[in-house]
């Protein structure tokens, strides 16, 4: 534990940003160029994955050129002491970046445009070319650093968040079944807990997409792909679980559903077996309880009555089936 403290203090992306800034400044100073514009570009180009850096860098370069071009143009027309120069440079840079679908580079383009205005004076062409060159230096340097230094590994984060998602899902499912048994079909507490789980699972899927991008850009062993596929399958199952869970949380208002004693006991046993997965590490089948709920659903389908009750029991059985397959 003590040997891992630094990972909580500074991350690989922070280190890569520092290295990119240092090398960018070195290259610019060696060429007698002002490094600040290149550094601005380098900072925003460090992305979670090498693929993202390359794709966004490809769009940030023309955006930066556009910003530098408008800075030179409006400085030539109004001078560097006019408010119009700053306002029009920023406005037209944003407008053109949006029209050309270069929004990802808008921020750095506007910053570059506004920052270079005071230093242009009469050297219009030189400043335009030098700012373009420094932008290229910043983009290339940060892109290479992001690709070569500390390639991101999100496996640990994904597994940690998946375990947390599992625990929260199972707990919420158990609590929601208790509410249903007690006829508390509207629950702000369950809705809030569901939203938290939903957002957490979105984070998992984002990290998995990052890791997949990294594997596609680096030569990795087959075991890396195998592990990623396992995590992806687990996240997909969680997504299905969450979807079915939402269907028993968000129910029509003023809904009334009555359950028999056997049905309540079946719901209790199934929800308890799912909740205990996190503590026991295994899934205890409740075949008799499942059969009880199936029989109820069939009876409701024949009579055509109480569709909400049938809907709730169906979703419970779908969740049970998902976990039965996972722990088969």
Swiss-Prot record:
What membrane topology is annotated for this entry?
A: Multi-pass membrane protein
Task: Give the main location.
Answer: membrane
| Pfam families in UniProt | ArAE_1
Look up keyword ATP-binding and say if it applies. no
Q: What keywords were assigned to this record? A: Cell membrane, Membrane, Transmembrane, Transmembrane helix
- Subcellular location per the Swiss-Prot or TrEMBL entry: Cell membrane
Record's keyword annotation contains Transcription regulation = no
The regions listed as transmembrane in this protein's record are 19-39, 61-81, 108-128, 132-152
User: What are its GO cellular component terms?
Assistant: plasma membrane
Among InterPro entries, the record links this protein to: ArAE_1 (IPR010343)
Q: Which superkingdom does the taxonomy of this entry point to?
A: Bacteria
Question: Family per UniProt?
Answer: Belongs to the UPF0421 family.
- Protein known as: UPF0421 protein SAR1980
